[in-house]
Amino acid sequence: LSPLVSAQNAVSKLSKPDQAKLWLAVGRLNVTDGGFCTATLIGRLHVLTAAHCIYDAETGTQVDVERLEFRAGWQGGQAEAYRKIGSIEVHPDFSFLGQTGLQRVSSDLAILRLLTPIQRPDINPFSVAQMPLKGAYVAVVSYAHDRSEAPRFHDGCRILGRKENVQVFSCEVDYGSS
């Protein structure tokens, strides 16, 4: 979301089966005839992603839910679970065409309701937690335009602070990581 780069971060591909199993709730949100974004299961029926991911960049309109599919644990051309989207709830302050910079980033959130729940016991939804404090370390797992077939694990991302209601951290993010 905010491309701050730090060479000290350890970045690795989630290729070890034991390591990848911890992150099966992270997946790709695919748009038919479009792109993709990182998305995360936050309940058996709900996925969190960036709001801009569900808009058509050419028209500025929200894409039809029929064009969206969540692929949990996507790696090497396969997912652990495939789910179509039933409905979309975009953050009320988000405007695809009317915002830029940190104002846009702070409200760039959407919750997608799946048509059917993901009930597998090995795919555990992430809980939504409080924002970590400055100085804390977090991990970021995401896909991006240059690594669309397997997520990357960014370990040791340090929280640098907050600016205009946006968490700023030391990890590199790229298109698709949202």
Each predicted region: which residue ranges?
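Short conserved beta-strand and strand-loop elements enriched in small hydrophobics
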Residues: 27-29, 65-76, 136-142
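Extracellular/periplasmic catalytic domains that process cell-envelope and extracellular macromolecules
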Residues: 19-22, 41-42, 61-64, 102-106, ...
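Conserved catalytic-core segment of clan PA serine endopeptidases
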Residues: 8-21, 55, 61-118
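Chymotrypsin/trypsin-fold serine protease catalytic domain
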Residues: 106-109, 114-176
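Protease-domain processing segments flanking chymotrypsin-fold serine proteases, especially trypsin-like
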Residues: 1-42, 152
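Catalytic histidine site
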Residues: 24-69
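Short, small/polar residue-rich loop motifs at catalytic or cofactor-binding pockets
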Residues: 33-36, 174-178
